[in-house]
Structures are given as C-alpha cells and as structure tokens.
C-alpha cells in the first residue's frame, strides 16, 4: 500500500514538473522568435531610412522603383534579390500604414462593445417606426381624429343636424346632456 502511494506521489510530481518545464520552453521559444523578428525589422527600417535620408518618399520615384524591382525579380533567378525586394516592399507598406494613423475609433473594452451592441439593436428595432399612421388608415375611412377631420363638410352638417334633432325630440337627463356636449368637442 505504501509503495502505491509513493508511486502516485512520484508520478504526480513528475507530471507537474514536466508541465512547468514545457511552459518555460514554449515561452523561451516565443521570446527567441520575437527577438529575431524585432532585430530583422530594425535592420530593414535602418536600411530604408538610409536610402531615404529625409524619411519621405518622392511620389515620382515610387513607381520607377517598384518597376525596377519587378524587372530585377523577373530577370534574376537568385533568391537573394527576391528577398531584398520583398523586404523593401514591406518597409513601404509599413511606412504607409504608419502615416495613416489609427484606423479604428472608440474603445475596445467590454462595456463599449455592449453599448455599441445595444445601440445597434435600438437602431434595428426603431428604424421602421414612423410618427405617421399607415396610408390606408389616413383615408376618410380610417380611425381616430384623422377620420373626423377628413370627413366632408356635408357629412358633418348632417351629423350635427341629426344630433340636434335627437336632443329636441326627447328631453334627456342632465347626465346625457353633459355627455353629448363632451362628444361634440
């Protein structure tokens, strides 16, 4: 029994130590790759800045240089010429992206993302809402105040006359008279 528990402890510690050392190896490999990339990037920028002392590229020289690089690539079969030309093109792209400045505006926090999402939902749900009623409801056969306003004068006169005849023909209680006054308004 003691032998099994000791073996389990050894296997557990071996697994933990093995996992820790594996993490260190990947991070050190990443650091090596990162440093190598940064050094090559610095060398390319240094070469580009020495070729353009002012740091600005003249617009007239750019097309001729790119044409010259393409001609060199097509005529020479050496791999060294192609890597130099691609490195030179990369530097130009990098320089152009630096001149453009930051492309995205706003923040990238989770709360900002939620606010943008809520705003988009509001726009999508509120876009179709109008302050006006549909066309078929605005017609004289429609509903509400629009219907009463759009009735022709002849029909209004008839409704007023018919309501007056009803009040004159039969005496109504004071409550009915108040209701009829309110409905006339």
From Swiss-Prot:
Family: Belongs to the adrenomedullin family.
Coiled-coil stretches noted in the UniProt entry, renumbered to this chain: none
GO CC terms, sorted: cytoplasm; extracellular space
InterPro entries hit by this protein: Adrenomedullin-reg_peptide (IPR051665), Calcitonin/adrenomedullin (IPR021116), Pro-ADM (IPR001710)
Subcellular location: Secreted
Protein known as: Pro-adrenomedullin
Organism of provenance: Rattus norvegicus
Biased composition, class Low complexity, residue ranges: 73-87
Propeptide: 45-91, 150-185
Expression across tissues: Expressed in adrenal glands, lung, kidney, heart, spleen, duodenum and submandibular glands.
Annotated function: Numerous actions have been reported most related to the physiologic control of fluid and electrolyte homeostasis.
Chief localization: secreted
Annotated stretches, region: Disordered: 68-89, 125-185
């Amino acid at each position: 029994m003691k032998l099994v528990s000791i073996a389990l402890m050894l296997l557990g510690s071996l697994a933990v130590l093995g996992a820790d050392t594996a993490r260190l190896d990947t991070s050190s490999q990443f650091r090596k790759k990162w440093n190598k990339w940064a050094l090559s990037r610095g060398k390319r920028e240094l070469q580009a800045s020495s070729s353009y002392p002012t740091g600005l590229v003249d617009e007239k020289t750019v097309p001729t240089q790119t044409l010259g690089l393409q001609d060199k690539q097509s005529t020479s079969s050496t791999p060294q010429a192609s890597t130099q030309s691609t490195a030179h093109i990369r530097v130009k792209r990098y320089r152009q992206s630096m001149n453009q400045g930051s492309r995205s505006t706003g923040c990238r926090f989770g709360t900002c993302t939620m606010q943008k999402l809520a705003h988009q939902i509001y726009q999508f749900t509120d876009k179709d809402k109008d302050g006006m009623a549909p066309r078929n409801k605005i017609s004289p056969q429609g509903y509400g105040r629009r219907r009463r306003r759009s009735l022709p004068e002849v029909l209004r006169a008839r409704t007023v006359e018919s309501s007056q005849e009803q009040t004159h023909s039969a005496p109504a209680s004071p409550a009915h008279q108040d209701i009829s006054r309110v409905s006339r308004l």
